[in-house]
Amino acid sequence: MAKVLYITAHPHDEATSYSMATGKAFIESYKEANPNDEVVHIDLYKENIPHIDADVFSGWGKLQSGTGFEELSESEKAKVGRLGELSDQFASADKYVFVTPLWNFSFPPVMKAYLDSVAVAGKSFKYTEQGPVGLLTDKKAIHIQARGGYYSEGPAAEMEMGHRYIGIMMNFFGVPSFDGIFVEGHNAEPDKAQQIKEDAIARAKEAGKTF
């Protein structure tokens, strides 16, 4: 039985969000094909995702110097403890499904905060004499992203930094398989928006069967 993290970063639900609608189609198809797998939905707009701030750096520094966890301040314990929970959960999963919109050429900031929380030496990667090495070499990931314009090719392609960033992080973590499903062009061509959405959902359903 595999453990799947369904990680969404959108303030809207599938009724109004193209990425969330496509993500829902994917994960429902996946669950139908893999009824015994565990799927955990992490809604980044509802979960507590601490930003790495002064409390976190202070807490980490104290722990590294030998201070016990219970000796940290209340704010340090809350944030450092939560980051530990998130990184442990991420490292223990087998598959990752990321769902985001493309906002200002990237993704909502809460996704960056989440990726920061799981980029932990000793869990998702390790340091060696040859440099950092990813530890999640038996995992797979997919990113479902809605883009109002066209970013797969043409002059705007180099401006897309959301999917590319997640791909870079997965590569850094050692994840050998990273794919994408894109819903694009619905704002550029609103008369085709419904068909664009339906086509993406169809592709998502097929991909979910074999993920």
From Swiss-Prot:
Species of the source: Bacillus subtilis (strain 168)
Description of how activity is regulated: Strongly inhibited by Pb(2+) and weakly inhibited by Cu(2+), Hg(2+) and Fe(2+). Stable in presence of Ag(+).
Keywords, in A-Z order: Aromatic hydrocarbons catabolism, Detoxification, Flavoprotein, FMN, NAD, Oxidoreductase
Activity's dependence on pH: Optimum pH is 7.5.
Pfam family, one: Flavodoxin_2
Protein name: FMN-dependent NADH:quinone oxidoreductase 2
Effects seen without this gene: Deletion mutant is sensitive to 2-MHQ and catechol.
Cofactor note: Binds 1 FMN per subunit.
Domain of life according to the entry: Bacteria
